[in-house]
Amino acid sequence: MEQLIIPAIIAIVVAFFSVYGLTPFVIRALEKRNITVVDANKKEKTMIARPGGLSIIVGIELSLIILYVFFPISEILAVILTTFFAFIVGLIDDRKTMGGWFKPLALAFCAAPILLLGAYDSNLDFPLFGSVKIPLLYTALVVFMIPIMGNTINSIDVLNGVASGFTTIASFALSILSLIHISEPTRRRGISYAVFCLK
């Protein structure tokens, strides 16, 4: 457990300061190019730079790369690739008007690194029945969970800060559960959750 603390602290610090430091530069660069939209959550017609996720994805990817240097396991590599691909899909969706089919289908393909690297467990643990191995069901869940999560976050983002607040609360709870778990690989995955919620 102790060997996880230093990498976690380094990843969290790098994620926080990279996002904190890059955001003003990203905002200025976008405003200079007039890439702005009306803030729909304010009464006044305030123009804001978009997309702001450019600095966030840098922070997430840097923190995950640091974790991967310390713990070169397929789960972290799969998260690095899946997160990056999902960001590209979101960026395309923001910049161009695509059909309603594009985002869910493209996000489903983003699950490819998880499947190809085998970064999932096909055993389901039920409180009453114990562990059950259902590989086909789990493969389907992996493919569907990425577009479901992406669209869920979009649907709850009704006010500034709601999506980030929700994901922070959910990630923090998952981090605690993962760190308590006796499995060492699961604890390492928990560290990656912690980086997201504390950055």
Task: Please name every model-derived segment.
Residues 2-179, 183, 187:
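"…together with the soluble PPM/PP2C metallo-phosphatase catalytic core" -> "…together
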Residues 184-186, 191-199:
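Positively charged, low-complexity/disordered segments
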